[in-house]
């Protein structure tokens, strides 16, 4: 049974601060707590994760994900994708155009000449139907109408967040459509393993490992060039752990194009769709670690290159490069690159994805 009387959470957030009505739909806060007393807090506006409370090597709990502490700030955030659920299409589509069955579709343009993260009002800006099924899990649903942001087909999307007693945040996605369309869902968590603060520390000393021999180079508008290049001998080689800041400002065209890291890594997979290790980070001072596992073929690594010190939960501030994102997904602009893994969803098929963020401590 869900404890509906509990109002004092370790994360310090209050349900009433997340309750409002938008276009006739109610928003709320859903707190998932495991047997250790650690927490994940989610709101059904954009499925935003607004707190992840896990201990450091001394056992001290802290929030390690960037977000806001009330619904109005979530809605008006300077970073509209801050730890939200992204769709219909995570990442960019060049010039907002793609073809399907010989017909060209034109999407909303919202990032230079391109369409980013589903358009001007993607899934991150929608109120989802939500049911907290127990103390550990919440299930959310959204129906994306035909023509929304220029996409074809009506799509029904289900997302389940669960938080295990092993400190695993498990995100399961599924979707169905009534007409052939494209889809690429992801979670855009902004992780700060040192703990959010005023100011939140940079990620320069964060030790990072990424299970990828290849990455996708981008042009000056952050669209993949179509090449798939080896990471060896480049700033993108994270096959062995190294500090994020070691090469983040390297004299490298790709680093300059992304203003740091904002690239899709092609994950090493034994077979398509397997749940496998993608990445690991460790924050040396706190000892906190996070491992990423996913069924997706790629992970977009973003190092918060455009933040300017805006405010978050409990007076925290988020300077440039104070978070890192691991957006498990299919490749950017896949509809315009036939040899990239397919993002087409047929009416007779179901889209599924699973990504796990596992938190731990290493002394």
Task: Locate the predicted segments by residue.
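An exposed, glycine/acidic-rich loop-and-rim segment of catalytic or binding clefts
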Residues: 2-363
């Amino acid at each position: 049974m869900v404890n509906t009387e509990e109002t004092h959470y370790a994360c310090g957030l209050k349900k009433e601060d997340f309750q409002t009505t938008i276009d006739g739909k109610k928003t709320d806060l859903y707190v998932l707590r495991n047997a250790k007393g650690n927490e994940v807090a989610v709101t059904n506006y954009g499925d935003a994760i607004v707190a992840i409370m896990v201990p450091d090597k001394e056992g001290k709990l802290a929030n390690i994900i960037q977000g806001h502490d009330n619904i109005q700030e979530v809605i008006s955030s300077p970073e509209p994708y801050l730890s939200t659920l992204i769709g219909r299409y995570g990442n960019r589509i060049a010039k907002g155009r793609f073809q399907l069955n010989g017909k060209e579709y034109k999407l909303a343009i919202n990032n230079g000449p391109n369409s980013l993260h589903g358009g001007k009002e993607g899934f991150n800006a929608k109120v989802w139907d939500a049911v907290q099924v127990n103390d550990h899990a919440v299930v959310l649903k959204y129906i994306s109408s035909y023509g929304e942001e220029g996409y074809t087909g009506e799509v029904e999307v289900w997302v389940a967040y669960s938080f295990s007693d092993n400190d695993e945040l498990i995100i399961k996605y599924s979707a169905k459509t009534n007409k052939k369309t494209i889809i690429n869902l992801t979670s855009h968590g902004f992780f700060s393993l040192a703990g959010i603060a005023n100011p939140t520390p940079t990620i320069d000393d964060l030790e990072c490992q990424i299970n990828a021999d290849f990455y996708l180079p981008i042009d000056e508008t952050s669209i993949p060039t179509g090449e798939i290049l080896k990471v060896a001998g480049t700033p993108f080689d994270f096959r062995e752990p190294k500090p994020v800041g070691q090469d983040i400002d390297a004299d490298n065209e790709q680093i300059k194009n992304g203003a740091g890291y904002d690239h899709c890594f092609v994950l090493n997979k034994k077979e398509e769709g397997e749940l496998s290790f993608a990445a690991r980070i460790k924050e040396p001072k706190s000892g906190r670690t996070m491992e990423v596992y996913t069924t997706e073929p790629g992970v977009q690594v973003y190092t918060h290159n455009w933040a300017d010190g805006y405010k978050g939960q409990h007076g925290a501030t988020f300077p440039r490069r104070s978070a890192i994102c691991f957006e498990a997904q299919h490749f950017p602009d896949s509809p315009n690159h036939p040899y990239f893994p397919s993002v087409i969803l047929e009416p007779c098929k179901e889209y599924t994805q699973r990504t796990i963020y596992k938190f731990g401590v290493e002394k």
